[in-house]
Amino acid sequence: MHPTEPPFQRIQFYLTAQYDCSYLPGRLARSQVATPTHLIDHHAYGALIRAGFRRSGQFTYRPNCEGCQACVPVRVDVSGFVPNRTQRRCLKRNRGLAARFLPLDFKDEHYALYRAYLGSRHAGGGMDRDGPEQYTQFLLSSNVDSVLVEFRDGDAVVMVAVIDQVDDGLSAVYTFFDPAREQDSLGVYGVLWQIELAKRLDLPYLYLGYWIGESRKMAYKKQYPPLQGLVDGSWQALEA
């Protein structure tokens, strides 16, 4: 879908200045941003997601980098997904976690978990210095159909996921978890749980953002076949 087609006719698009790529060292990135945010309703947002856009706070964007197409938007066809042996073990290990749907409200324990996660996984990347205001703008500001899911082990919050719902699926916005529980593979469980949620809601897809084959942080997404990628303007199967 091209940005000049419905329902994009009232939405404008601009290109950001170039900035250092977060995933591929030594490369410059640039984004195409949809604006104004108040016109991006549920219907328009779903169309943008299908066109390869993502949401960060109230900004809806997609990569538009000169000479680079490494970022491939991907989605899981949830009806065809069958967990492998390792994923089944992960599901079994974490079945005791209690999931609770919450509005996008600030909670001190969520923010503390977010800081611990970034300090362990993304130290020195800039995000690990996010204060409460940056956290709120990034994860708790939304004009679309969004929910925060809290996962508890007893009294302890061990994982938080922010999820958007669109017409044909769920979009995994961001998930963070207790870095001290690496043996529980909570990141994997978060994806598996969202696949199961999409199935329960009778939605065909879970949108996972961008797959980048050269980035170890993003290449994991091929572990959830059947995976489709938006290539040359059309969604097509990606080889596992």
UniProtKB/Swiss-Prot annotation:
Compartment(s) of residence: Cytoplasm
SUPFAM superfamilies noted in UniProt: Acyl-CoA N-acyltransferases (Nat)
Record bears the keyword Metal-binding: no
EC number of this enzyme: 2.3.2.29
Record's GO cellular component terms: cytoplasm
Domain of life: Bacteria
Catalytic reaction list: N-terminal L-glutamyl-[protein] + L-leucyl-tRNA(Leu) = N-terminal L-leucyl-L-glutamyl-[protein] + tRNA(Leu) + H(+); N-terminal L-aspartyl-[protein] + L-leucyl-tRNA(Leu) = N-terminal L-leucyl-L-aspartyl-[protein] + tRNA(Leu) + H(+)
Gene Ontology BP term (one): ubiquitin-dependent protein catabolic process via the N-end rule pathway
Alphabetically ordered keywords of this record: Acyltransferase, Cytoplasm, Transferase
Enzyme class: transferase
Disulfide bonds: none
UniProt GO molecular function: arginyl-tRNA--protein transferase activity; leucyl-tRNA--protein transferase activity
Function: Functions in the N-end rule pathway of protein degradation where it conjugates Leu from its aminoacyl-tRNA to the N-termini of proteins containing an N-terminal aspartate or glutamate.
Family affiliation: Belongs to the R-transferase family. Bpt subfamily.
PANTHER family: ARGININE-TRNA-PROTEIN TRANSFERASE 1, ARGINYL-TRNA--PROTEIN TRANSFERASE 1
The protein, known as: Aspartate/glutamate leucyltransferase
Native source species: Thiobacillus denitrificans (strain ATCC 25259 / T1)
